[in-house]
Design a protein with these regions (language model features):
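Glycine-rich phosphate-binding loops that contact phosphosugars or nucleotide phosphates
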Residues: 290-440, 520-525, 529-566, 584
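Acidic/histidine-rich
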Residues: 152-186, 463-489, 524, 531
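Active-site phosphate/pyrophosphate-binding segments
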Residues: 259-263, 267-296, 377, 387-516, ...
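Glycine-rich oxoanion-binding loops at beta->alpha junctions
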Residues: 49, 66-83, 274-286, 310-346, ...
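Short, glycine-/Ser/Thr-/acidic-enriched flexible segments
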Residues: 9-13, 39-41, 49-50, 74-76, ...
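Generic C-terminus detector
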Residues: 226, 558, 568-609
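Conserved short alpha-helical segments that host acidic/polar catalytic motifs at enzyme active sites
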Residues: 1-245, 249, 264-293, 332, ...
Length: 609
């Protein structure tokens, strides 16, 4: 949510800032702005809508300067408008801000009493005025910056410039991610490494409560008490070209088709004969999980659905009681924590606000250890967890998660095998069989992609539909939830996922001849039960779309469309049956003409609570 880019250089920085914003569009936003300093003057341009609107405005008006900040805004305080867009200016200062200042109304009243006037409805304008207020009483802008930040409550990632000091860029982080990019004779700040890949591969990750001061020749990082800190430099191996669409129409389409390779990357170097390398999970040894007797998984959105699938595998393969909870709910109940409990978080970005807050809460509770399943090395979740299992999905730009989800599932299966082996709950024969099945996964994923053309044609039947029901049983119930989420978030068709056994407990009342019902029906031990649910739907005249294994024998009639999918090992079914549901959502969105990669009101990384 929101994006920040800042630069201090010996060249014009406006194109660097605009390119950085373009690379952050996937995070979700409703307006954008840029501010540079030229001849001790603040040049500020703001627009609503897409970054391309800002680029056109900059091209028309010009925005010179060798130092500047830029921002994409997601409305929290105040409607989307040019007035509310960032940067916000107070006299000589310009500020961009990600996060929420919780006590802004109280501070605003105090500043109004001091004679400050406000143009916008935002908490960010209040913050820049607060910094300006402290500057009048401080010996330096750095001191004023620290004083203001010690006064505010909430979360923030900030970048600040001063027209009276056109060679220095200030930044601070508390709850909202910020990274520093190191160049030669130039330095940068951003909310995501992707924004800076065209200009640097060397990064410093700011931690909670840290302030950075950047010039062309130096970077200094302080805590809020003013103590200078030593920071490690991290070299990124990500390729700037890896985030191009290539021959694909949308990032989502590309990322769906990348799944065979992404799954292969998740396995790379981790399978050794019938064993999984201990190096798969960073930080563990052969005894790490021996005493674990309960597992708590916490995640949001699609990652939560991955956790629900993971529970089936963890309990079946390890015998350990596993609970899964939405992060924003976990934080607000008094959890009963057993002595030898493992706390597991799942997040693609590693910056999801509620998931991070849950991890920090867990550290105050009685958990033995914490483990994160994450796609981004160096993210806050990775740095703050005891152990990490990297999904290695590669950059995912589309807001709707695809390859990140399937690699999360594979990572959870791998984790279950590692814990099961340490606990002695998996026989050698079972371990061998599962690992042999896992080796087939990338090739099977490619086979499942071969149904794309059929699903593209099928999706035309969803045109004009306003509601849809997804049904699944057992481990496929979370996949039904995920299928419904994908459809609703990118095609804007209202969709709900239900456990098929719950059909008679409410959702059957909604079924009529106009409602598509999607059934996830792999050939497994629950097929007979699922067939009964299918017949109940059929009897009420609904439009049935059944995603089924080739070897399963289900009848097809005028109201039923069957999509036959390749046979696959039962333990891999949740991963593989996800792929056709992703394709269905994608093609429905294309037909409906929605913004597939940046659906309305959604953000890739939810970094505010």
């Amino acid at each position: 949510m929101c994006g920040i880019v800042g630069a201090v250089a010996q060249r014009n920085v406006s194109q660097i800032l605009l390119e950085g914003l373009s690379r952050l569009e996937y995070r979700g936003y409703d307006s954008a702005g840029i501010c540079t300093i030229d001849n001790n003057t603040l040049n500020c341009i703001k627009t609503t809508g897409k970054v391309k609107n800002l680029k056109e405005a900059v091209k028309e008006k010009g925005c010179p300067g060798s130092i500047g900040i830029a921002h994409t805004r997601w409305a929290t305080h105040g409607i989307p408008s040019e007035v509310n867009a960032h940067p916000h200016i107070c006299d000589n200062l310009a500020l961009v801000h990600n996060g929420i200042i919780e006590n802004f109304a109280e501070i605003k009243e105090q500043l109004i009493a001091q004679g400050y006037k406000f143009k916008s409805q935002t908490d960010t304008e209040v913050l820049v005025c607060l910094i300006h207020y402290h500057l009048q009483k401080s010996s330096s802008l750095l001191e004023a910056f620290k004083s203001a930040l010690n006064e505010v409550k909430g979360s923030f990632g900030l970048a600040l410039i001063d027209k009276n000091d056109p060679n220095t860029l200030y930044a601070a982080r508390s709850g909202s991610p910020l990274i520093i990019g190191l160049g030669i004779g130039e330095n940068f700040i951003a909310s995501d490494t992707l924004a800076l890949l065209p200009v640097t591969r060397r990064f410093i990750f700011l931690e909670e409560g840290e302030i950075a001061v950047l010039t062309t020749e130096s970077i200094k990082v302080y805590d809020l008490d003013g103590n200078e800190l030593h920071k490690d430099i991290v070299e990124s191996d990500m390729d700037a070209e890896s985030i191009s669409k290539g021959p694909y129409r949308h990032y989502m389409q590309k990322e769906i088709y990348e799944q065979p390779q992404s799954l292969q990357n998740t396995l790379l170097g981790r399978l050794r004969g019938d064993d999984i390398s201990l190096e798969t999970v960073v930080g563990i040894d052969e005894n790490t999980f021996k005493d674990i007797d309960s597992i708590q998984i916490v995640a949001c959105g699609t990652s939560y659905h991955a956790g629900l699938v993971g529970r089936y595998w963890l309990e079946a393969l390890t015998g350990i009681s596993t609970n899964v909870e939405i992060a924003s709910e976990y934080r607000y109940r008094k959890a009963v924590v057993r002595k030898n409990s493992l706390f597991v978080t799942i997040s693609q970005s590693g910056e999801t606000a509620d998931t991070l807050a849950s991890l920090r809460l867990a550290k105050e509770q009685n958990y033995k250890k914490s483990l994160c399943i994450c796609n981004v090395n160096g993210s806050s979740l990775v740095r703050e967890s005891d152990f990490t299992l990297f999904t290695k999905a590669g950059a995912e730009i589309g807001v709707a998660s695809t390859k990140a989800f399937t690699t999360q599932l594979l990572s959870l299966l791998i984790l279950a095998l590692i814990i099961g082996k340490q606990k002695g709950t998996i026989s050698k024969e079972q371990n061998h069989e599962i690992i042999e099945d896992i080796r087939k996964l990338p090739a099977l994923a490619q086979e499942f992609l071969d149904c794309d053309k059929e699903i593209s044609l099928l999706s035309e039947q969803f045109s004009g539909k306003h509601h849809c029901l997804f049904l699944g049983r057992g481990v496929m119930f979370p996949i039904a939830l995920e299928g419904a989420l994908k459809l609703k978030e990118i095609s804007y068709i209202h969709a709900e996922g239900y456990a098929a056994g719950e059909l008679k407990h409410g959702p059957i009342a909604l079924i009529d001849k106009e409602m598509p019902v999607v059934v996830v029906a792999p050939d497994n031990s629950l097929m007979d039960k699922l067939v009964s649910n299918i017949e109940e739907v059929r009897a009420r005249g609904a439009l049935l779309y059944i995603f089924v294994s080739e070897q399963a024998h289900l009848k097809e009639d005028r109201q039923t469309r069957k999509v036959s999918l390749p046979d696959c090992p039962e333990i891999l079914q949740p991963i593989l049956f996800t792929i056709p549901l992703q394709l269905l959502a994608y093609h429905c969105a294309v037909i409906n003409g929605t913004d597939v990669d940046q659906p309305r009101n959604l953000a890739k990384s939810v970094t505010v609570e």
